[in-house]
Amino acid sequence: MPQSQGTGPGVITPDGCAVDFYAMLPDFGEPAIVHEAAGSGAAILELGCGAGRVTHPLIALGHPVVAVDESPEMLAYVRDAETVCARIQDLALGRRFGAVLLASHLINTDDETRRVFLEACRRHVADDGCVIIQQHSPEWFATATDSEVTRDGLILRLRDVTRPAPNLISATAEYVAGDQRWTQTFTTTRLDEAELAAALAAAGLRLDRYLTEDRSWLRAVPVIGSG
């Protein structure tokens, strides 16, 4: 599983996310990208939905959403969607969807976790559907450094950035809302194009196209007969 841990008030999920802070976060443009890639009205399976910051705008755009997260505390914030409390790798709904969403850089993890996450995507995507994936961009891996962003009164800091190996970045995300403060320490793994293609192929998927100029979002499609 991803190497991460969190601190701060309230519930912290197994992967280090602070439920109270994630419930405050707005979207950062993700729903528009997903909507364009999935197609109007497509049913979406959202893996790792958190507190619904992307779920709710997708529903507003006309998508039926099944929202999956391992944290019941996160799912308690999700409205107007079918919710499933499960780990991604254990998910077996027996249904296929027009689009499966794997956001939040969940693909930038260790090889085994990436494999089981992509296999979950493949067994739930329709043959004529797509898998929409968010990854850390190549540029981010090359340039990531300590930084700070403020959005809607919330402060998001990245600090203690190190590169323990050529393909790894370790850092601490610090989140501040008023007098509350949380941290999430994590390690993330870079994928080059060949590694990405190989990971997709192993799961019965192939790259269709990149969705953003920086290649942080991509659309994959099933290899017919593979799942």
Name each model feature, range by range.
Residues M1-G50:
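Conserved class I S-adenosyl-L-methionine
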Residues A51-D90:
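Class I SAM-dependent methyltransferase SAM/SAH-binding core
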Residues A92-V100:
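A short acidic, Gly/Pro-enriched loop at the edge of an enzyme's catalytic core
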Residues L102-S104:
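Residues lining the SAM
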Residues R115-D127:
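A short glycine-rich, Lys/Arg-flanked "PGG" loop and its adjoining helix->strand segment in the class I
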Residues I132-E195:
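SAM-dependent methyltransferase
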Residues E195, A199-G227:
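C-terminal lobe and adjacent flexible extensions of AdoMet/dcAdoMet transferase-like proteins
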